[in-house]
């Protein structure tokens, strides 16, 4: 609901599905970058930031993924897989004892998602 409210008040085009898709993939990428700093013994803020990015990606994904699926089902599957991996990496507000996802795997999935949308989203939208 907060995301929808912000989109309604945001700049023209903020609610465009391509822009929402780009924002979703950006949040997945940021969650991936936080993961290497988000384990036990690391600052808790890194984990919370990653969790926030993963949840923002989850909440913003439906409109962008539906839009992408109509154009390129394989690219949509790639983004959905990266999102699922991000949500697995950040299962809740407590840092897991053992990481569910290795940082290099998450970074690779995020990179694949960025590449998958690159021909559907303009550079300014990424």
Q: Where on the chain are the PLM-derived regions?
A:
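Mature extracytoplasmic or organellar-lumen-exposed domains after removal of signal/transit peptides
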Residues: 1-126
